Amino acid sequence: MTARLLTPSKITAWLSCEHALTLQHQLESGAIAPVAQPFGSFARLLANKGLEHEAACLAAYRAQGLSVLEIPDRKRSETFAEWVERVGDPFAEGHDVIYQLPFAHDGVRGVADFVLRVVDEETGQVSYEPVDAKLARSEAKPGHVLQLCFYAEAIEALTGTLPAQMHLWLGSGEFETIRTNDVMPYWRHLRSGSNSLMSEAETTPIPCDHCEICDFASVCEDRWRAEDAVHLVAGVRTVDLAPLEAAGIETVEALAEVSPGSELEGVDPDRLLRMASQAELQRAARTGPGEAPPPFRLIEPPDGLPGSLGYEQLPEPDDGDVFLDFEGHPFWRPSGGLFFLFGWLCRDDAGDGAGGAWTYHARWAHDLDEEGEQVGELIEYLAERRRRRPGMHVYHYNHTERSTLERLARQHGVGELLLDELVGTGAFVDLLAVIRDGMQVGVESYGLKHLEVLAGYQRGEDIGQGAGAVVAYEEFMANGDQDSLDRIADYNADDVRATRALRDWLVEQRDDAHHWRDAELDPDEQPEELEARVAALKAFGPGTDEHLLADLLGYWQREWSAHKVQRMSRLMGLLGS
């Protein structure tokens, strides 16, 4: 049998999902065949962005006038151990920076992005500290720190001195430093249990965050479907699996058979009933006609309420309504992302908001300045449209568009008070919240693309969902191909049209017992004057007292808005539990 190799990345994977490491070992031993990579172009995009970040870090070291040793690449014909032997001891040469240094130490192997030569100013003692370049922007992740711990341990074995510090060069450009002794005990604890990492003990796949980036996602997905795993029921959470399994409920079929009034230790009775109802709907969807939309049922309102909690969030349709969707590139630059398309659907009109045809609008932003301009113009457009038609609303699916617009308005310092007024007076309507609190549907996911079939919506453009839009935009950045932008716009137009179709379908299902949500709440304050004051102060330019004062104006309104959003999110979580 081929000897199993341990790497820092394997230990990181093991922390996230034991089964992922089991499958990796099975792949290396030939027990399972290579798996088609599920993320394809997007995974390559991320890898390329990582290499770009490394190259930028390397260039920065050179720009500082430091002597840099680039380790020759590993030859195809040599093993990792032979590569390490060929590299020898690069520390003896006294370079300030060593790039891509391979280590093999105590059964673990890995390659450090950078190793820095450090001289103690008081004693003159020389030591070496590892630096890893990561696309993460805000702080180190546990796996990143563990990799650095291995490099530090390997450096100590070669030089006799444990690095006092380890470093991460984040995608944001920040240089995060970690005291080695603060984290090394945990690394050594993990290493002491490495036998369990290398064992052939049976593991079971459990859904976790690692699934989103795992090379073996399709392997586990096939197994779960073959087993009819209970977590395929929409709304079943990881914390529900243990009590369900303890009660012998391990499949969708078994959960669907749970009768009303049943009790299960560790699960709220109302929640158990809701999960069982969801499983029953999904089972019915499997046995129904292939082209038929999935079955659904309205959720009965709690005692004392006249109508569904979901439908109570739905306002009466208006000719001024707008349907909104954004597309963004999270890794546009290592230092930050970019929202490059702001798309919406509305009725064009001559001023009164009535009678026009539904038209799709696409506004592009190819740099941060343009992003700020589009955000400001969009907020002004929505505010002006709502002034003319107070009954209009901005519909979106999931909270992303509203929360993104709030974040971008703060980031660019544009339209914050106007947006606060729109949010505070209920202009934004999240259709996912309406559906989640108002009905159950026989689908595994409540994403837009799974629910638009209820309205009979048929898509025209499919570019692999959101990640596909990112890849297509990357193609545009590489070659300026207009066709890439056209495909993204067609995809985005599908999203807003599907959102409108779903809204119209919800209105058709509405019972007269449900009340329309109030169209508008009268704000206590008019933001126009304050907005003008802010603009006048901003004109003094960054760094001035006036510019700082502009940022402070409206502070309490923004804080109150954020407080309300947090409270509503918690309330929705309780209602959905």
Regions of interest found by a model, annotated:
Residues 25, 29-66, 76, 517-577:
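Accessory interdomain/linker segments of ATP-dependent helicases and helicase-like nucleic-acid enzymes
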Residues 247-333, 384, 542, 555-577:
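Long, highly charged low-complexity segments
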Residues 316-377, 420:
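Metal-dependent catalytic core segments for phosphate chemistry
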Residues 10, 182-209, 213-289, 316-318:
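Cys/His-rich finger/ribbon microdomains and the adjacent scaffold used
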Residues 309-314, 319, 323-335, 340-341, ...:
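RNase H-like, metal-dependent nuclease domains and their acidic two-metal-ion catalytic environment used
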Residues 75, 90, 94-105, 109-120, ...:
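Conserved DEDDh/DEDDy metal-dependent 3′-5′ exonuclease domain
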Residues 165-227, 238, 247, 443, ...:
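Acidic, Mg2+-coordinating catalytic module of metal-dependent nucleases/exonucleases
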Residues 1-123:
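Metal-dependent nuclease catalytic cores that hydrolyze phosphodiester bonds in DNA/RNA
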